Regions:
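Acidic/His-rich active-site region of diverse nucleotide-sugar glycosyltransferases
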Residues: 1-42, 46-47, 55
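Short loop segments at secondary-structure junctions
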Residues: 35-36, 64-65, 106-108
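Catalytic donor-sugar/metal-binding loop of nucleotide-sugar-dependent glycosyltransferases
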Residues: 39, 46-49, 55-77
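Activation segment
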Residues: 41-42, 80, 103
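Non-transmembrane alpha-helical segments in soluble domains
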Residues: 58-59, 100, 139
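Nucleotide-sugar-dependent glycosyltransferase catalytic core
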Residues: 77-97, 132
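Non-catalytic, C-terminal membrane-associated alpha-helical segments of glycosyltransferases
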Residues: 94, 110-170
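Catalytic-core region of carbohydrate-active enzymes that cleave or remodel glycosidic bonds
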Residues: 96-101, 106-110
């Protein structure tokens, strides 16, 4: 166990490729970061109430030169309490908006566009065609994008994401 956690904070990508199994998945409900990484990249974005904050942290992690280790050696139990959840359409709207903010901040424009198309369709499907909520979400998204700091992942970070088969298109 210590061995796995020790490798989680390693800045050398080659170490993962040559010595340890590597998976590109990152779960928001169970993760560990080295303190130095959080000091370097910052913590959760304060305007993310729910959804996609793990993507924001993982892209910041890659930009800082770290690798992400996913291991099946650790068990996390994540209980979802339906009494503590927002209505489904609100939850879907937050996820759509937050995902787009994260992609806008970290990925090249091509991926911003493909995410917008795919997540628009997904939101409209999951919300049973809630057009009014869709347009309100887009207006809120555009307001947040005006103040979000855009700092796109560089070529080596993008290559890393492609190497680990990260989900870039949607």
């Amino acid at each position: 166990m210590y061995e796995l956690l020790r490798y989680c904070g390693c800045k050398s990508r080659n170490l993962f490729y040559s010595h340890k199994p590597f998976y590109n998945l990152f779960f928001g409900y169970g993760h560990v970061f080295p303190r130095d990484l959080i000091v370097e990249t910052g913590f959760y974005q304060t305007d993310f109430f729910y959804g996609m904050e793990e993507y924001d942290l993982s892209y910041a992690t890659v930009k800082a030169g770290y690798s992400i280790l996913f291991t099946k050696e650790i068990l996390v139990i994540h209980k979802q309490n339906p009494n503590g959840r927002e209505p489904s359409v609100v939850k879907q709207a937050r996820m759509f908006e937050n995902k787009m903010i994260v992609v806008y901040k970290h990925l090249p424009w091509l991926y911003v566009m493909t995410h917008f198309i795919m997540w628009s369709a997904f939101f409209l499907y999951k919300s049973k065609g809630s057009i009014l909520v869709y347009f309100k979400t887009i207006l809120s998204m555009l307001r947040r994008m005006k103040i979000a700091r855009r700092n796109v992942i560089g070529a080596s970070g993008m290559q890393y994401l492609k190497d680990v088969q990260a989900r870039l298109w949607y």
